Amino acid sequence: MHIALAGNIGAGKTTLTELLAKHYKWSPHYEDVDENPYLNDFYEDMQRWSFNLQIYFLNSRFRQVLDIRSSAKTVIQDRTIYEDAEIFAPNLHAMGLMTTRDFNNYRSLFEMMNTLIQAPDLLIYLRASVPTLVNQIQKRGREYENSIRIDYLKQLNERYEAWINRYKAGKLLIVDVDRMDFQNNPEDLSNIIDRIDAQIHGLF
């Protein structure tokens, strides 16, 4: 089984992935952030490095999905391939930070990959307001994230909401991060687990 977490930068995907993997004894697959050779450069000069970064993420997540589907284990994935293609790359293109030529090349590659993969069995979307995202980003203190702009997070949030509203590829669970603290409050985590159980076992 393939469970995936989706959400904006700072929504709490990695934290919830860890907690759910521990609870269910699922195998976690994390976003390839530390190994990404383009991330620091991208936040310094988005226009120069946007295409390279997005191709790196696309390749990384495509390989990840193939690994997940060939695994006998239940896997929980931190961020999906769809977020790159539906949110981050189109946003960079709309902001003038990725050329139309590069964006069309990227979309063509994604569309080919998309014919070879399956959607997650359950997608968990972490919905968070911009103030919550900023607070979480500041708390974790990743140096390369210091230059992320408020308007950038806002644009990403708008694209996330549009994508989630039209998502029909599989089961979907929405978690309102503004209203809970699953990291520090066991009751909030328990509530999420109950909702996941209902989805997995078809008890709506």
Model-inferred region functions:
Residues 5:
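Hydrophobic anchor at the beta1->P-loop junction of P-loop NTPases
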Residues 8:
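P-loop (Walker A) phosphate-binding loop of NTP-binding proteins
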Residues 13:
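Conserved lysine of the Walker
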Residues 16-17:
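Post-Walker A alpha-helix
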Residues 22-60:
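Conserved substrate/cofactor phosphate-moiety recognition/catalytic segment
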Residues 49, 53-118:
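Glycine-rich phosphate-binding loop used to anchor ATP phosphates in small-molecule kinases
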Residues 87-161:
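A glycine- and Lys/Arg-enriched "phosphate-lid" helix/loop adjacent to the NTP-binding pocket
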Residues 134-204:
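NTP-dependent small-molecule kinase module
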